[in-house]
Swiss-Prot record:
Organism phylogeny: Eukaryota, Metazoa, Ecdysozoa, Arthropoda, Chelicerata
Signal peptide stretch: 1-19
GO molecular function terms listed in the Swiss-Prot or TrEMBL record: ion channel inhibitor activity; toxin activity
Protein family according to the UniProt entry: Belongs to the neurotoxin 10 (Hwtx-1) family. 13 (Hntx-13) subfamily.
Pfam families reported in the protein's UniProt record: Toxin_12
Membrane-spanning residues: none
Designated name of the protein: U7-theraphotoxin-Hhn1a 4
Free-text tissue specificity from the UniProt record: Expressed by the venom gland.
Protein source organism: Cyriopagopus hainanus
Highest rank taxon of the organism: Eukaryota
Primary subcellular site in the record, as a coarse category: secreted
Entry keyword NAD: no
Keywords: Disulfide bond, Ion channel impairing toxin, Knottin, Secreted, Signal, Toxin
Length: 90
C-alpha cells in the first residue's frame, strides 16, 4: 500500500515539473512570436511610406507607386492613387 501511494505521489510530482517546464517554454515562444510580429510590422510600415498603394490618398508630398497615378475621383473629396493602365516590364 505504501509503495502504491509513493508511486502516485511521485507521478504527480513528475507531472507538475513537466507541466511547469511546458508553461515556461510556451511563454518564451509566445514572447518570441510577439517580437517577430512587431519586427514585421515595423518593416511593412517603412515600405508603406515609400509610395502610396492602390486607392491610397496622394498629394505632392505623398506620391503613388510607379504603376499608379494620382487622380481626383468624385465623390471622394481628395486625390487617390489609381491604376495608370500600364504593365511593368520584366
Amino acid at each position: 500500500m505504501k509503495t502504491a501511494i509513493f508511486t502516485v505521489v511521485l507521478a504527480l510530482a513528475v507531472f507538475a515539473v513537466l507541466s511547469f517546464g511546458w508553461e515556461a517554454n510556451e511563454e518564451a515562444l509566445s514572447e518570441e512570436f510577439t517580437e517577430l510580429i512587431h519586427e514585421k510590422e515595423a518593416a511593412s510600415e517603412t515600405e508603406a511610406r515609400e509610395c502610396r498603394y492602390f486607392w491610397g490618398e496622394c498629394h505632392d508630398h505623398m506620391p503613388c507607386c510607379d504603376w499608379l497615378v494620382c487622380r481626383y475621383k468624385w465623390p471622394i473629396t481628395y486625390n487617390i492613387c489609381v491604376w495608370n493602365r500600364t504593365f511593368p516590364e520584366k
